[in-house]
């Protein structure tokens, strides 16, 4: 446990947006799950946020279940972390509305992610524009002190800090100002050599198996250097992916084979395929077991929601009192 995370309340949210791939795993998921052994962790499935891009009920429901299965299979332990659906804590929407009343339009208009998503063809909905306020509510309602994020989310954390500061100046010191921890960047090339991304269609899925996985790995783009010739591992996508899984000794051994010549890229791809299967085999089996017991997964999410709502309700009572409302709505 690092000094930075010790004693912190850590919040991490993931949008249910499809199948996990190696870029997701090494870029964020693995790091976030490991944090459960550090501070007090809250992990939520951001299904409210997902509505900005997913407008099919069956798709959203299935994607949400997939995220739960993925994270639990990859090692998220509900005994160590609070794991729940965002939509099971409706208080977050009440807080988002209250926060919106102290948030200037100019702050939202500067949101880079909104502009980028609209440029990519996503509908410029009010919900998409409002996204940073709901994200601020997600963070503040659990009184989070640390949020692990990638570079593309830093602005949203800074906006949350601004919104919390404005609220505190208006109504008193209610919210701790959250900090963030940048995810360690991992260079994860896709099968075409570009950054691995769903939008490029170049991913290797974590839970793919058998022929589909083999076809994907064996299809990684390489140069045309002959089998007998030495090769430069630093310029090879296969070696870059292999290095994410291998020990230093294993990397050194494969590097020597590259530089010595006599090894084709097909052999390197088979070594990578073996590593991928070795690394994820236990998680794949666990995911299958969990998928056969959906009631158990639902129980985990409900238990997490009960714990999360306790925190959310305590915060919203403080907020309602601070702004001049009754602690609880009159029924």
Give the positions of each predicted feature:
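A generic secondary-structure signal for well-formed alpha-helical elements
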Residues: 68, 75, 103-106, 144, ...
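Short catalytic-loop micro-motif centered on adjacent basic/acidic residues
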Residues: 82-85, 148, 225
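Conserved nucleotide- and phosphate/pyrophosphate-binding catalytic cores
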Residues: 24, 155, 161-331
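Short helix-capping/linker segments at secondary-structure and domain boundaries
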Residues: 105-109, 141-148, 246-254, 284
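Internal, conserved structured core segments that host functional sites
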Residues: 114-163, 167, 171
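Short, polar/flexible loop-turn hinges at active-site or ligand-entry regions and domain interfaces
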Residues: 56-57, 147-150, 228
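N-terminal Rossmann-like or analogous alpha/beta NTP/dinucleotide-binding catalytic cores
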Residues: 2-137, 288
């Amino acid at each position: 446990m690092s000094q930075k995370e010790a004693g912190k309340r850590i919040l991490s949210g993931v949008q249910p947006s499809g199948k996990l791939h190696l870029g997701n795993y090494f870029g964020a998921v693995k790091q976030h799950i490991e944090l459960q052994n550090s501070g007090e962790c809250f992990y939520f499935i951001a299904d409210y946020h997902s509505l900005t891009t997913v407008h099919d009920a069956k798709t959203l429901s299935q994607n949400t279940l997939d995220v739960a299965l993925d994270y639990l299979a990859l090692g998220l332990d509900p005994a160590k972390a609070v794991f729940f659906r965002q939509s099971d804590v409706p208080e977050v929407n009440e807080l988002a509305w209250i926060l919106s009343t102290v948030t200037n339009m100019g702050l939202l208009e500067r949101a880079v992610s909104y502009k980028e998503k609209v440029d990519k063809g996503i509908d410029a909905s009010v919900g998409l524009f409002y996204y940073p306020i709901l994200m601020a509510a997600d963070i503040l309602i659990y009184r989070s002190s640390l949020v692990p994020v990638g570079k593309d989310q830093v602005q949203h954390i800074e906006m949350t800090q601004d919104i919390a500061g404005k609220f505190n100046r208006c109504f008193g010191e209610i919210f701790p100002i959250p900090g963030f921890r940048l995810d360690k960047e991992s260079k994860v090339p896709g099968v075409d050599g570009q950054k691995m991304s769903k939008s490029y269609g170049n991913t290797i899925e974590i839970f793919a198996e058998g022929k589909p996985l083999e076809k994907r790995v064996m299809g990684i783009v390489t140069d045309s250097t002959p089998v007998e010739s030495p090769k430069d591992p630093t310029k090879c996508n296969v070696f870059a992916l292999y290095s994410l899984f291998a020990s230093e000794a294993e990397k050194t051994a494969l590097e020597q084979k590259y530089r010595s010549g006599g090894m084709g890229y097909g052999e390197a791809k088979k070594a990578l395929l073996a590593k991928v299967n070795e690394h994820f085999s236990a998680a794949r089996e666990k995911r299958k077991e969990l998928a056969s017991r959906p009631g158990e997964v639902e129980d985990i999410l409900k238990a997490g929601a009960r714990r999360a709502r306790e925190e959310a309700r305590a915060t919203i009572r403080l907020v309602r009192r601070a702004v001049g409302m009754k602690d609880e709505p009159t029924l």
